[in-house]
Curated annotation (Swiss-Prot):
Family: Belongs to the outer membrane factor (OMF) (TC 1.B.17) family.
Residue numbers with lipid attached (N-palmitoyl cysteine): 18
Mode of membrane association: Lipid-anchor
Gene: ttgC
Task performed by this protein: The outer membrane component of a constitutive organic solvent efflux system. Is involved in export of toluene, styrene, m-xylene, propylbenzene and ethylbenzene. Also exports AMP and the antibiotics carbenicillin, nalidixic acid, chloramphenicol and tetracycline.
Gene Ontology CC entries for this record: cell outer membrane
Keyword Nucleotide-binding recorded: no
Lineage, broadest ranks: Bacteria, Pseudomonadati, Pseudomonadota, Gammaproteobacteria, Pseudomonadales
Gene source species: Pseudomonas putida (strain DOT-T1E)
The protein, known as: Toluene efflux pump outer membrane protein TtgC
Alphabetical GO biological process terms: response to antibiotic
Induction trigger: The ttgABC operon is repressed by toluene; this is mediated by TtgR. The ttgABC operon is induced in response to chloramphenicol and tetracycline.
Lipidation (S-diacylglycerol cysteine): 18
């Protein structure tokens, strides 16, 4: 019996090397080898530190924003859910991995039964006792064709994908907090600008109204001045509402209220961000967690094909135990009371109405779907980086042009005001200068906000936002396979 068990174990070990998982090959990236070139793009420059390895504390210069990001990483609910999902998939992997090994259990039992006389072979009533103690394996599947190992591989890749999903969630959170913060700052600047402009309009309106009372200004001039005041009041209410809504958005992202001891923010036009290098398109394949997540899911689908293939072959399960059996507890472990059970079972699929073939087809289709998703993720990443690179140069030029436009409108406003005060030009010219200056100043703040959010999105598109400090990438080890 011992030789038979040994032979079976050796055979299972030899066949255990059999795997029906298809050889995995990473699909070709469906994007160009270089970033787009043209007048809208600046020449790409190399750097010692890739964007994905640049710490967010080095990228964001505003101490208030750094404080908000740190708060969000502690309290944000989406990030908490992503971390819990990671723990859940790790547990699922450990559960599946445990099927590779036999589950050994020890059992002990005892029973006493009274047998009536008419049921006894001796014709007399009596009491029978039975006690047992066994150690054994129950329904352990010998993984001859790799079905269990395929499922374990699938669970591992799913777990690894959840780790990358958590990284993606954090990177997206850092960018979202930054964009929400800059929007809040911009709306505050617009609100302050509108408040100052409204005061100017009201002063002009009161002056025009007094001029009308003495016959210098016409009723039309008064009406035009009032129109400017009411228009500014509309903007005042609008920006007041937006500032309040910006605070609400930030509160959700932070997972708590804005800290009362928030550091003093930088001015919106200050040096807010460090420049990030674009690198090569091939770099994002290794640095974007969403791409790595998609590839892990593709590998998981590939492993499922191995499990579907293995279902066509016989499966062998083994139940075995050894122990002792005695009618007397005191002699349970005495010599001669030994007992054993060896119960192999083989299951050979013969007819299943095509379900196994359909299951294999389904697993192959799922792999093709994941290939398409993987390629789409790469294409989306390429587009996001390309858009960010195009925005970088054009926003610099646009902002400079807008600053020049504001300066020109300030000159126009000063001249128009002077000419209106001394009676050379009408009130219409002066009001037009006021409106043009107000519009140009609003546009400058809006363009600056668009530039900042574009740079933040480029940092995110390049995989930045995972590390707090530059240099941590070399200190942190890659994700380890969890131990069972």
């Amino acid at each position: 019996m011992t030789k038979s068990l040994l032979s079976l174990a050796v055979t299972a070990f030899i066949l255990g090397g059999c795997s029906l998982i298809p050889d995995y090959q990473t699909p070709e990236a469906p994007v160009a080898a270089q970033w787009p070139q043209g007048p809208a793009y600046s020449p790409t420059q190399s750097a010692d530190v890739a964007a994905a390895e640049q710490g967010w504390r080095q990228f964001f210069h505003d101490p208030a924003l750094q404080q908000l990001i740190q708060t969000s990483l502690v309290n944000n609910r989406d990030l908490r859910v992503a971390a819990l999902n990671l723990d859940a998939y790790r547990a699922q992997y450990r559960i599946q991995r445990a099927d590779l090994f036999p589950a050994v259990s020890a059992t002990g039992s005892g029973s006493r039964q009274r047998v009536p006389a008419n049921m006894s072979q001796t014709g007399e009533s009596g009491i029978t006792s039975q006690y047992s103690a066994t150690l054994g394996v129950s329904a352990y599947e010998l993984d001859l064709f790799g079905r269990v190992r395929s499922l374990t591989e699938q669970a591992l890749e799913t777990y690894l994908s959840s780790e990358q999903a958590r990284r993606s969630t954090q990177i997206a959170l850092v960018a979202s907090v930054a964009n929400a913060y800059y929007t809040w700052q911009a709306d505050q600047a617009l609100f302050k600008l509108t408040e100052e402009t409204l005061k100017t309009y009201e002063e002009s309106y009161n002056l025009t109204r007094r001029s009308n009372e003495v016959g210098v200004a016409s009723a039309l001039d008064v009406s035009q001045a009032r129109t400017a005041v009411e228009g500014a009041r509309v903007k005042y209410s609008q920006y007041q509402r937006l500032v309040a809504q910006d605070v609400n958005s930030l509160t959700v992202l932070l997972g708590t209220g804005i800290p009362a001891d928030l550091a003093k923010p930088l001015e919106l036009d200050a040096d807010q961000l460090a420049e990030v290098p674009a690198g090569l398109p091939s770099d994002i394949l290794q640095r974007r967690p969403d791409i790595q997540e998609a590839e892990h899911l593709l590998k998981a689908a590939n492993a499922n094909i191995g499990a579907a293939r293995a279902a066509f072959f016989p499966s062998i399960s083994l139940t075995a135990n050894a122990g002792s059996l005695s009618p007397d507890m005191g002699h349970l472990f005495a010599g001669g009371q030994g007992t054993w059970l060896f119960q192999p079972q083989i299951n050979l699929p013969i007819f299943n109405a095509g379900s196994l073939k359909a299951s294999l087809d389904y697993s192959k289709i799922q792999k093709d779907i994941n290939v398409a998703k993987y390629e789409k993720t790469i294409q989306t990443a390429f587009q996001e980086v390309s858009d960010g690179l195009a925005a970088r140069k054009t926003f610099e030029e646009q902002l400079q042009a807008q600053r020049d436009l504001v300066q020109a409108n300030q000159d126009y406003y000063r001249l128009a005001e002077r000419r209106y005060r001394i009676g050379i030009d009408s009130n219409l010219t002066f009001l037009d200068a006021q409106r043009n200056l107000f519009s140009a100043q609003q546009a400058l703040i809006g363009d600056r906000l668009s530039q900042l959010t574009s740079e933040v999105n480029l940092y995110k598109a390049l995989g930045g936002g995972w590390y707090e400090q530059t240099g941590q990438a070399n200190q942190q080890a890659s994700v380890e396979t969890p131990k069972g």
